[in-house]
Amino acid sequence: MGKTREEAMRGIEGQRRAIREHIEKYNSYPHQYDKDFALKTIRRCQGEIRTLKSQCNVSIDSSWEDDWNP
């Protein structure tokens, strides 16, 4: 059975919040290895968003965080 929209949105909003935090970190880090770590976290969160959307029984609109790229 799929997730309800409310269940999916709770998870998606948490992932989007983490993406926003790591974008700030990405932009402030001076070293590439730190940027790579932040980018890895962002990509993982974006994957979680895709999974949550696919498990939901209704369509969920995309947000800029879902596809952010540096």
Located regions from the model:
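Mixed-charge, polar/low-complexity N-terminal
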Residues: 1, 23-24
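Short intrinsically disordered terminal tails
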Residues: 1, 69-70
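Short, charge/polar-rich alpha-helical segments
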Residues: 1-17, 34
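Short, charged, amphipathic alpha-helical segments
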Residues: 9, 32-50, 69
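Amphipathic alpha-helical coiled-coil segments
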Residues: 19-20, 26, 42-65
